Amino acid sequence: MTELSRIRNFSIIAHIDHGKSTLADRFIQICGGLTDREMAEQVLDSMDLERERGITIKAQSVTLNYKAKDGETYKLNFIDTPGHVDFSYEVSRSLYACEGALLVVDAGQGVEAQSVANCYTAIEQGLEVVPVLNKMDLPQAEPERVAAEIEDIIGIDASDAVRCSAKSGLGVEDVLEDLIKKIPPPKGDRSAPLQALIIDSWFDNYLGVVSLVRVTEGVLRKGDKIVIKSTKKAWNADKVGVFNPKPTDTDVLEAGDVGFVVAGIKDIHGAPVGDTIVHQKFAEETPMLPGFKKVKPQVYAGLFPVSADDYDDFRDALEKLTLNDASLFFEPENSDALGFGFRCGFLGMLHMEIIQERLEREYDLDLITTAPTVIYEVVTKQGETLSVDNPSRLPDIGSIEEMREPIVEANILVPQEHLGNVIALCEEKRGVQKNMHFMSTQVQLTYELPMAEVVMDFFDRIKSASRGFASLDYHFVRFQSANLVRLDVLINGDRVDALALIVHRDLSHRKGRQLIEKMKELIPRQMFDIAIQAAIGTQVVSRVTVKALRKNVTAKCYGGDVSRKKKLLQKQKEGKKRMKQLGNVEVPQEAFLAVLKVDN
């Protein structure tokens, strides 16, 4: 039993590639969590996908015992958090379980926009933020400049920040000592009735729902009768323990601890994230803990199984993923071109890619994705306001009074030498500059941009415009009236609902032309001409034709009368005419994805 004064709960805030997962590896090694043989790089990034892309997607937790220099043994609960902007809600959930956070900054690169955003989240939640300068072994490390930058941008004193190199292990023990000194111990009363917050849950095929919890009051023991507050259902706590990093049964979790609980819950919605676990006998009087605010999806796309037989498996897979990823939203949808599927809401393009890859890998599904769109507000002539997340559900142009698109405020940090390129890119994306602040080597830009322009490929474009040095963080501000139209794609006169886009009227001609040129390359040639048109309402803005293949029907006539050849050609002509009436064109999967790549 560890006293509260010797427990420290903390997480690490860092930008992508600033060495957060490597630092976690060093902590685990120093505290003897794993033997050297079991030590893999990035132990906590357990998903294959996380390792391949080198990013952290899911929050993980580890409990370590560290013998400090004052002779005491401290229990460190460390919760790993993602650094990418699409996963910022994962970060805020992890921070709920902590009293402090390490802000890890690369001493060569300096502060990045996402660390700033996550750092503010931590400060808002009342956490103690301890700055750490990492990658001190690199020749380009400039700790003095970066410390000044942390002070300038974030406003926390970094003059005595610990300097370390997670890769070589230099100074990592000093980080642990500093953390014990500066981060306060958890508060909580172990004799009070149980209250535990569910930080994360995932589905295990053998155990059912496994929940990661932070106990705030009381004690949770194996065999206790527990109640999940929102569902009011009672369960038996079958397994209780901690991750160090392997799951280890401890049979008891006390106030201040972070660990897991398995209660044989087989229903996926049985233990929602952000819920409170209490003891059955005090279930009525124990209040709920303040949970997390629900995040609203920013980007919507249709996902359809390639074969219709997979529809049920697809639904089960989505349900299991929503348990693990609270921000994923889905509802059934059917499309004339693609059959039955789901309309899913994501936090951003990276989130969408990750979810699609997880569905294809972990659940073995083949999926087709339609072009992602953001939510638009439409005011009709009757004065009612609709939210539209699917271009094919847009009302008729004649009945629309005005359309409003979502606007985001983007904070961009960019080195001065790349400022021109980044400003040019923001202007091209219909951005409005709000602020510009020069710091030692970087410039902080604030722009208001249409969300539709940001979610598509803005992140990649801004990285390439600045050679990878710019960083971006954005949040939704408001809906604003704009001149928007629906761009339809017609193939042989038939509208393909899955290819519709909502675009700004000024860009519609260019976008329409680019899109159908792209489609022309991807649709295979048939025995008849295929007309591909881009239209706004009834007005066609551009058209291309995929030429027919010609079969030489007169090849078998050696010499002979010309009327024989005419007869064969006439017969072919009639056949083509009939084929054109009945023939339908298969649109390949690549063509649906062409819509995403139109800008480039």
From Swiss-Prot:
Biological role stated in the UniProt entry: Required for accurate and efficient protein synthesis under certain stress conditions. May act as a fidelity factor of the translation reaction, by catalyzing a one-codon backward translocation of tRNAs on improperly translocated ribosomes. Back-translocation proceeds from a post-translocation (POST) complex to a pre-translocation (PRE) complex, thus giving elongation factor G a second chance to translocate the tRNAs correctly. Binds to ribosomes in a GTP-dependent manner.
Reaction catalyzed: GTP + H2O = GDP + phosphate + H(+)
Superkingdom: Bacteria
Location(s), subcellular: Cell inner membrane
UniProt record similarity statement: Belongs to the TRAFAC class translation factor GTPase superfamily. Classic translation factor GTPase family. LepA subfamily.
Annotated gene: lepA
EC top class, as a word: hydrolase
Span of domain tr-type G: 5-187
Gene3D superfamilies xref list: 3.30.70.240, Elongation factor 4, C-terminal domain, Elongation Factor G (Translational Gtpase), domain 3, P-loop containing nucleotide triphosphate hydrolases, Translation factors
Main location as per UniProt: membrane
SUPFAM superfamilies the record matches: EF-G C-terminal domain-like (SSF54980), P-loop containing nucleoside triphosphate hydrolases (SSF52540)
Sites where the protein binds GTP: D17, H18, G19, K20, S21, T22, N134, K135, M136, D137
Identification of the protein by name: Elongation factor 4
Classification of source organism: Bacteria, Pseudomonadati, Pseudomonadota, Gammaproteobacteria, Pseudomonadales
Coiled coil: none
Enzyme Commission code: 3.6.5.n1
Gene Ontology CC terms: plasma membrane
NCBIfam families in the record: lepA, small_GTP
Species, as recorded: Marinobacter nauticus (strain ATCC 700491 / DSM 11845 / VT8) (Marinobacter aquaeolei)
Membrane topology per record: Peripheral membrane protein
